[in-house]
Amino acid sequence: MAASSSEISEMKGVEESPKVPGEGPGHSEAETGPPQVLAGVPDQPEAPQPGPNTTAAPVDSGPKAGLAPETTETPAGASETAQATDLSLSPGGESKANCSPEDPCQETVSKPEVSKEATADQGSRLESAAPPEPAPEPAPQPDPRPDSQPTPKPALQPELPTQEDPTPEILSESVGEKQENGAVVPLQAGDGEEGPAPEPHSPPSKKSPPANGAPPRVLQQLVEEDRMRRAHSGHPGSPRGSLSRHPSSQLAGPGVEGGEGTQKPRDYIILAILSCFCPMWPVNIVAFAYAVMSRNSLQQGDVDGAQRLGRVAKLLSIVALVGGVLIIIASCVINLGVYK
C-alpha cells in the first residue's frame, strides 16, 4: 500500500510538473511581456512567439521518462518525492532559463520593429501634415506689389530736383535775355552755374558788365524813362519796343554784336535848316520841328519813331525848298518884267 501511495503521489507530481512550467511565473512573464510591448503599437503584426510550452515539451519529456524509472525503483519517502518534485520543477527552470534569454531577444526584435513602425507612422503623419505647408507659398505674390509701388515713389522723388533744376537755368536765361535787350552782355555758362540763381524782377547782377560800358543804374534810368514816355504818349499799348527790350539791328554797326552794318536812321535836320531860307516858312518850320523830334527819339532809342519822324521832316523840307525856289523865280520874273 505504501508503494502504491508513493507511486500515486509521484504520478501526481509528474502530472503537475508540466503544468507548473506552463503556469509558472516565467510563463506569465513571457506571455505578459511581449503583449505589453505590442499593445503600444496596434498596427504591428504579432509575430509567432515560441511559447514555453513548445520549448518545454521536448525538454519535459526527458525528465518524465527518467523520473518514472527512478520513482519506481526508489522506495516511497519524503526525500525522494522532494527530489522528484525538484527534478520535475528543474525542467521548468530550464525552460525558464531557455525562455528568459529568448524573451529579451523577442523584445529587442520587437523594439526595432516598433521603432521602425513608429518612424514610419511619424513619417506618414509628417507627410499628411506636409501638404498644408504649400499654403504659405502665395506669400511671395505680394512681393511684386511693394516692388511696383516704391518704383514710382523713387522715380517721383528724384524727378522733383530734376524739375526744380531747370528753373534756375530758365531764370538765368530770362535774365540773360533781359540783359541782352538792355544792351547787357549775358552771363557766362560758368557764372550761371556757380553763382546763385537770380530772383525774377531783380536788377541785373554786378558781375555782368554792359556792352556799351554804361553802369546798371543808367540802364535802369533808361528803362524808367521809356516807361514814362509810353505813359504820356498817345500809344501806350504800342507794340513797338524800345532799346531796353528789343535791340534794333539798325543801331548796330560792323563792330557791334548782332549788327548787320546798316546805317542809322537819318533825321534830315540839315535839309530842314536849308528849307528855312526859302519863302515857305510854315512848311519849313514844321519840317525843322520834325527833324529835331526825330533826333530826340533816336537818342532815346526809339528807332521806329526816329525813322517815321525823319521821313516827315524830309518830305516837308523838300516841299519847302521846291516851293521856295519856285516863289523866288516867280518873284524875279515879275520884278524884272515890270521894270523893263
Curated annotation (Swiss-Prot):
* Extracellular topological domain: 339-340
Query: Where Omega-N-methylarginine occurs along the chain?
Result: R240
Task: Name a biological process GO annotation.
Answer: negative regulation of SNARE complex assembly
Does Membrane count among this protein's keywords?
A: yes
Q: Does the keyword field hold Membrane?
A: yes
Q: Name one GO molecular function term.
A: syntaxin-1 binding
Q: Which residues cross the membrane?
A: 318-338
Please list the residues that carry the modification Phosphoserine: S28, S238, S248, S249
Ranges facing Cytoplasmic side = 1-268, 290-317
Intramembrane ranges, chain numbering: 269-289
Question: Disulfide bonds, which pairs?
Answer: none
How is this protein situated with respect to the membrane? Single-pass membrane protein
Domain of life from the UniProt record: Eukaryota
Q: Which family does it belong to?
A: Belongs to the CD225/Dispanin family.
Subunit info here reads: Component of the outer core of AMPAR complex. AMPAR complex consists of an inner core made of 4 pore-forming GluA/GRIA proteins (GRIA1, GRIA2, GRIA3 and GRIA4) and 4 major auxiliary subunits arranged in a twofold symmetry. One of the two pairs of distinct binding sites is occupied either by CNIH2, CNIH3 or CACNG2, CACNG3. The other harbors CACNG2, CACNG3, CACNG4, CACNG8 or GSG1L. This inner core of AMPAR complex is complemented by outer core constituents binding directly to the GluA/GRIA proteins at sites distinct from the interaction sites of the inner core constituents.
Protein known as: Proline-rich transmembrane protein 2
Supply the source organism for this entry.
Homo sapiens (Human)
